[in-house]
Amino acid sequence: MLTESAIQQECVMYFRNKFGLKHHIPRLLMFSVPNEGKNMIEQSRKKAIGLMSGVSDTIIDTGKDIIYCEFKDAKGVQSPKQKEFQEHVESLGRKYWVIRSLEEFKNHLTTNH
């Protein structure tokens, strides 16, 4: 079973190779959101500059859509803050995907993009 980090890594690599290279027109974006601090001091500093609990692991910008992706392993569940963030972005008309595998990510890209 892959870790959440390994699933995210596979998906980012796939996306960048398929949609994010210099020769791709349009060249799409997928980037991570570092939303964890190493300690309380760093966490407080990050909150002061905009850290938000529950934000998705990555964000995709297609030029038309903003898609928020949260990566979970087979047993992983969203925290209450993650669910709250999902509800917030969906209320703004944005897409939010919970991804558990590269295949699921590819399927979302095919059917929802």
Q: What kind of feature is each model-predicted range?
A:
Residues M1-H113:
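Catalytic phosphate/metal-binding cores of nucleic-acid and nucleotide-processing enzymes, i.e., regions
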